[in-house]
Amino acid sequence: MFEGLSEKLERSFKILKGQGHITEINVAETLKEVRKALLDADVSYKIAKDVTNNIKEKALGQKILTSISPGQLMVKIVHDELAELMGGDHAEINIKANPAIVLIAGLQGSGKTTFSAKLANFLKSKRGKSVLLVAGDVYRPAAIDQLKVLGEQVGVEVYTEIESKDPVSIAENAVKYAKEHNKSVVIIDTAGRLAVDEQMMDEIAAVKAKVNPHETLFVVDSMTGQDAVNTAKAFNDRLDFDGVVLTKLDGDTRGGAALTIRSVVDKPIKFVGLGEKMDALDIFYPKRMADRILGMGDIVTLVEKAQEQFDAEEASKLKKKLAKNEFNFNDFLKQIQQIKRMGSIKDLAAMIPGMNKISDEDIDEDAFKSIEAIIGSMTPAERENPKILNGSRRRRIAMGSGTDIVEVNRLIKQFEETSKMMRLMTTGGAKKMMQMMSQMRRR
């Protein structure tokens, strides 16, 4: 995500490396590169110029503390400016009413229908809401079928009127149905078009006027850059929506839409889509996104994802097993599967400070597959008691998993080291754990 922008900004900060003071000359050199990085990210010239002018004003007015280098100060100023550009504080979706009506708008191909299902899943699983999805696209039967399939995947009812060609009537009837069936949120997926046109605008404006939604969200494909921003402006001028959803953000290396859409339409980005899976949806936090752009990671989101996957009761059981030295490959496999559910290795790595520099070639998304294959080739007794894994058993496991003995031995070694480290963490041996980690690094 935004790899190109991150690399260019990092290079621009190197101009200040070794400099004792911030001066007009070195600030000008740095900001020339920052402006170029923003323009390459598909940020408009006016916004790039405004941002760099703000940074210059703040940088030249700062006093350098002896403990902070000019480069560090510049990173902090750029971070704050990027966060402010993307909206500052995050904005919550308004679902206080009962039922809360959420209207979804956007161009065809923006990921609107997929987002509708993701939002339903999010509100059901993380907010405890009873959700009704509404198929309001009367022009594309495939869109109705898609929403029905996705609704089934996430366990959410989908309201349809197959014979009707009136989206206003469908939306009105769906809200009545939701009230009769005690639904707490109604999500209305509307028709998309290949381009902005008057018929589309009139239609969705009529739906909005009839059902009076508590939240209107505009969905855009972040990979379309300034086109996404221009489309959002055209919609907002007519529809006056409440927030933006950026889809396909995981494939966006530039970041122009995320950086500029707020300043153009004066509406917050509320959600971002990060993949095809139904749980690949995140609340948008401008400050956390600025952290990730500048290679500072996003530990808060990483911890939140971990908390969603790791059950407190299971963690307590695991702690007891570790204390008794009973951690086995069944437990190890369970931990691996929980980590997998948190997201792709690439996305998780981007949340760890400094890990954004790791190239795609160094990230093996299939690494867990071979681990699962090796553990799957063990007998129940071997998984329960790893101490019995002698040479002949390891050769059999390698053959059964389609790997080689080196990979099997490596996994067993990793298992043993993980077990020791986790045991030290649970028994309070922090000092011993740090010594062990330093020894592992020296190998």
Summary of predicted features, one role per range:
Residues 16, 42-44, 78, 107, ...:
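Residue-level signature of catalytic and energy-coupling elements of molecular machines
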Residues 29, 33, 50, 54, ...:
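Amphipathic alpha-helical interaction segments
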Residues 171-175, 179, 183, 195, ...:
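Conserved phosphate-handling catalytic cores of large alpha/beta enzymes
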Residues 8-136, 143-164, 171-190:
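Primarily NTPase-proximal linker/entry elements flanking Walker-type ATP/GTP-binding cores
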